[in-house]
Amino acid sequence: MIYWVRSYPNGIKPMRTTIKLFLPIIIALSITFTSTAQPSGSFISEEAQESCVKYGEEYGICPELLMAMIEKESSGRPDVESGGCKGLMQISGRWHKDRMERLGVTDIYSVDGNIHVGADYLSELFEKYCDVGIALMVYHGEKNATTKAELSDYADWILTRSAELERMNGK
């Protein structure tokens, strides 16, 4: 029941009236946002999350690490382009043309194709450097990544976010 009062003492509305008026709106919004939330706690699309799981399994990479990279590289937007790098994982067609051909990826803006190329490259870096921090810094194109004594802010952010996503997924 909503209370309609034309005048209030000291101009202050009774709290119960305000709550009763806004409660249906609050409930509707909470249902809307709860139902659209991603299961991993990430804001990237379900399609991208599925590709992260698929290529994570194929290459032995934690899917949450790939998701964290996507969040950092493109904010989960497959249409992003920056400095010649494109898509979710910011792949450079110039540097990864052969890799794309080998993997059969023709559209770098394709969610699945972009993640496939990024995971393949990251896997190669893991094999070469045997260190996830160094691999992330090289992926990011950081100079002297192999001789740095500490992780870069980029690598640290990716690892921290990956751990958060893993906890959200019960790992």
What do these predicted regions represent?
Residues 34-36:
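Membrane-interface motif at the C-terminal end of an N-terminal transmembrane signal
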Residues 38-171:
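Catalytic glycan-binding domains that act on GlcNAc-containing polysaccharides
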Residues 13-23:
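Bacterial N-terminal signal peptides that target proteins for export
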Residues 22-32:
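Bacterial N-terminal signal peptides
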